[in-house]
Regions:
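Flexible loop/turn segments at secondary-structure boundaries
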Residues: 41-44, 70-74, 140-141, 169-171, ...
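Noncatalytic carbohydrate-binding groove/subsite architecture in carbohydrate-active enzymes
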Residues: 180-316
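Carbohydrate-binding surface patches
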Residues: 388-426, 430-436
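Bacterial Sec-dependent N-terminal signal peptides
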Residues: 1-21
Length: 447
């Protein structure tokens, strides 16, 4: 029998102020609370207030458009994402052709005859979100990205930066990007196009994953890129692998058979996540800092996507702690933009919302993300972290040094707790919890 799914209690505490003598207070970076929008507008309707009201409960500060891989084939003046299947097939990547044939079929089925930039603008305006754009640098007209920038500026939507392609270090693109030199040629061309019209807009380049047994195509990718000066930031995609098996750019492609119980299996995943937050995350970023003297944009992050961990309590606790580490860890402050993968789509392991016939489902990450949005509602300027055994506590203070909210990620009791100071010595407490880390949420996001 499961414990209570989502409940609220009120209790009383005294003296919620902090006596710290901190003199300089840095504002928490709101650009770390962002979301990728790949496939969001194909499977979810921005004219459906039941959907947009849920998004507004999260209130994303940043949205990424068009998204991930799809950005490399996006065309501004065409229907939906403007996909041209003959153009995509030319790369000789069967999974691309299959995926985008299916997406085009779905768009036609739903009579989506407008470009999805219209839906994106509507969603961004509803949430007062800034935008990170991804330029198609492999198949678009030269002025496509300029027209996109002009459109967002005409709508008074702030552009944080432009990514020069998405994951173009991936071997899927080796037919025409066989080396970092090929990528630099394309990226510099589009950087020059953007900077000529809009010199104030930052551009980011695609870094290569740093891992053992680097393929020869990637061996000198980062080093050569670090010697260039035409860009402002590097782009890193961060997907933590906790499942044994094979993975490829954020997705588990094969999982080893598991003979242990599900509880033992997820306890192992928990151990790997805790190790990551204790040392691994910082080490991951330091490796890039040692090569590049640039800010870092993490424009996709999540657990490696898998039906095993997707939509579980484990995933929701991971997502909560990842964001809190981004916002509070001084060793991660070179990360200036972060967008979670993904806001909405048709998958179970990547998206907060899953589009279904006649509506959408809510996944386990939703309620914790609404908790975390409280950080920006309360004008938090500092987050202090404390660790007690398997409990990670994040205390959040305002500019007058008052403790406004606190988050407890309790890996022992399998719960995420939000405590809000309501004044007059009262605290409002909300919990998201379940008996087991492998418990999955129902279609309303409850465990």
């Amino acid at each position: 029998m499961k414990v209570i799914q989502l409940y609220i209690i009120i209790f009383y505490l005294f003296s919620l102020s902090c006596n710290s003598q901190e003199n300089i207070v840095e504002q928490i970076n709101p650009n770390l609370f962002g979301f990728n929008t790949s496939n969001t507008f194909t499977y979810c309707d921005v004219n459906d207030t039941s959907f947009t009201n849920k998004v507004q409960k999260i209130k994303p500060n940043v949205l990424r458009f068009p998204g991930g891989t799809i950005s490399n084939f996006y065309h501004y003046d065409e229907k939906a994402y403007g996909l041209d299947i003959s153009e995509i097939s030319d790369w000789n990547v069967p999974k691309f052709t299959k995926r985008y044939n299916g997406l085009i079929k779905e768009q036609k089925k739903r009579n989506h005859n407008h470009n999805y930039i219209e839906d994106f603008i509507l969603l961004a305006k509803k949430n007062n979100s800034k935008v990170v754009l991804v330029a198609n640098i492999i198949s678009s007209e030269d002025d496509d990205i300029i027209n996109m920038i002009k459109r967002f500026k005409s709508e008074n939507i702030e552009i944080l930066g432009v990514e020069l392609g998405s994951e173009l270090s991936n071997r899927a693109y080796k037919k025409y990007i066989n080396s970092v030199d090929d990528y630099i040629h394309l990226a510099q061309k589009y950087s020059n196009i953007i900077k000529k019209e809009y010199p104030e807009i930052k551009v980011g380049v695609v870094s290569a994953p740093i891992k053992y047994n680097m393929p020869s195509r990637l061996l000198n990718w980062n080093q050569k890129l670090s010697e260039e000066t035409f860009y402002d930031a590097i782009i890193h995609h961060s997907y933590l692998k906790v499942i044994d098996g094979d993975d490829d750019y954020g997705l588990m492609t094969r999982e080893d058979e598991v003979s242990s119980t599900k509880k033992a299996q997820f306890d192992l995943y928990k151990k790997r996540i805790k190790t990551y937050f204790n040392t691994g995350f910082v080490k991951e970023i330091i490796k890039y800092n040692e090569i590049f003297e640039k800010e870092i944009w993490i424009t996709e992050w999540n657990l490696q996507m898998s039906k095993t961990t997707g939509n579980t309590l484990l995933q929701s606790l991971f997502v909560s702690q990842y964001l809190l580490e981004l916002l509070s860890n001084p060793d991660l402050q070179n990360i200036s933009i972060a967008t979670y993968h993904n806001l909405a789509g048709r998958d179970i392991s990547g998206s907060v919302f899953k589009g279904i016939k006649g509506g959408f489902e809510i996944h386990s990450t939703y309620y914790p993300l609404t908790f975390l949005s409280k950080i920006f509602e309360n004008d938090i300027v500092r987050i202090e972290k404390e660790v007690k055994d398997e409990v990670f506590i994040y205390d959040c203070f305002d500019s007058t040094n008052n403790l406004k909210i606190s988050f407890d990620i309790n890996w022992e009791k399998n719960e995420f707790i939000l405590s809000e100071n309501m004044g007059t010595d009262s605290v409002y407490v909300t919990k998201y919890l379940s008996e087991d880390l492998f418990d999955m949420s129902d279609e309303e996001g409850k465990l």
